[in-house]
Structure formats: C-alpha cells, structure tokens
Amino acid sequence: MTNYLVVGAGLFGATFAHEAAKRGHKVHVIEKRDHIAGNIYTKEIDGIQVHQYGAHIFHTSKKEIWDYVNQFAEFNRYTNSPIANFHGEIYNMPFNMNTFNKLWGVITPEEAEKKIEEQRAVLNGKRPENLEEQAISLVGTDIYKKLVKEYTEKQWGRDAKELPPFIIKRLPVRFTYDNNYFNDPYQGIPIGGYTQIVEKMLDDDNITVETNTDFFDKKDEYLKDYDKVVFTGMIDQFFDYKLGELEYRSLRFETEELDVDNYQGNAVVNYTDKETPYTRIIEHKHFEFGK
C-alpha cells in the first residue's frame, strides 16, 4: 500500500485519487481553494448551474472515457456551437460553410476553398513563423482580420505576430454546414453540474480531503511524510522557479445576474473586436437548454 499526497482537487487529481483508492492505497488530497473540482467547479445559482471558471464542455472520441465519466453523472446532449460577434455581425464557429456564406456569399465548399486559397497567396508559400501567418494559411485574410486577430490579441495580451504558430495549429475549419465545434462522437454537460463528479470520485474511505490548504506552506514536511506526491499545480513554482517563471495566460471573470429569460440566445458568444473589453459572454442556462 502506498501513501499518496495529491495536490489539487481538480479533475486530474480526483481521478488519480479515485483510481488509487480503488486499488487499496491511502490518498490525502489537499486543495488551495475553498472548494473541490478545480476549474470545472460549478455552483447552482437560482436554479442555474454556473461554470465558475469559464465554459467547460466534456467531449471525447473514446467510448471507454465516456462510459467512465457517466458512472458519476448523467450527461445531457449539449453540443458546443459558439458564435462570434464582430461589431454586431454574427458568425458561426467553428469556421464552416455558414461562416463562409455570411462573409463572402459563397454556397459550395469548392467556392469557399477557392476563396481561402486566393487569400493564402499573400504568404507566397512561406512556412508560417507566427500565429498571424498560421491563421492566414488556414482561413485566409478576411476571417483572420475579423474573427481571429483582435480576439487572440485580447486573449494573450500580445501582437499576433509575436505569438508562436502552434497556438492555433488545430484551428477547426469545416467545409460543411455543421456548427458542432468538436468532431468527437461523445459530447455533453453533466446534468446538475460538474462538481458532483468530483464529489463522487473523492467519496471513498481511503481518501481524505482538505480544502483551504496550500502545499507550499509545508512543502518540505509534505514531501517527507508521504511515499509519493502527485502535484497538479504550477510546475515552475514546485521547483522554486529555478529556471525562471513560466508565462501563464490569466483570466478575469465578471458575473452579472439579469432578470431576463434569455439574454443572448446562445451559451457562448465571443467578441472578436478589440474595442469590446472582454473576450466572451457566457449565458450558463443554455448549457442545460434554458433550465
């Protein structure tokens, strides 16, 4: 039997703790925040499950993973279909035939592919060396300027030319009229929120949980007292920033409660212009179909 310390009660930490406990190991989970579930933490407010740290849509291509999470919660059939708002113009995401039709009036995939190919020509066959060039190589200049450039620069706080190309290596582009953001066959959101999943994972006699507990307050003591430590926090902090600090993208969340039945008609609306001082608005009730 191994005596484990798991630092962080998010999805990874909880899954590890659950599986280790099933195998007879003792697991102590500590969490710096005042709640479990990490960034997938959901909280019910006026009957609505609010994703406290931004939208999380569960999706996977593997049936065994889908079956695994369905042990802990029933999932609805929610399909992620965000939209983009650029100065009041609404576009479908991921970039697909609906987007191309709105932008250029094209109807067939052949017309759309031809339009993008024409716009890629500005690169003169050059291998993309930054995010801007990578985006243009994938979707052309029009979509890049309206739906990628300013949104990305708001997200990262950097000029797109200064960002590496791999950030949008997998920018989804579809030559169909399908608004489903993901290709995975299994997708949904747990009815009643994500927090219950982590609660059930950690409900085991071999698991103890402490919240409001910072690993770094007693790091040396923890490392001495446990056989093995599973650390899910910032890796540069764990090593005392010996190689310097990694750059992390941070987010600020602002919450409003409005007395309206339906504010924006969609769960997620991205604002892709630089003048709007935020990246997106999330209306959480739509994750469970308006309930």
Regions found by a protein language model. Name each.
Residues 2-29:
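N-terminal Rossmann-like FAD-binding beta1-loop-alpha1 element of flavoenzymes
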Residues 21-46:
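Glycine-rich FAD pyrophosphate-binding loop
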Residues 23, 213-291:
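Mid-domain catalytic core of redox enzymes
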Residues 26, 49, 74, 206-210:
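Conserved beta-strand segments of alpha/beta enzyme cores
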Residues 40, 44, 148, 242-243:
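Short, flexible helix/strand-to-coil boundary loops that buttress conserved ligand/catalytic motifs
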Residues 46-122:
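Dinucleotide-binding Rossmann-like beta1-alpha1 core, especially the glycine-rich loop
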Residues 52-56, 187-188, 253-255:
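A short acidic, glycine-rich active-site loop
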Residues 87-92, 97-228, 232, 236-239:
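Active-site/ligand-binding neighborhood in enzyme catalytic cores
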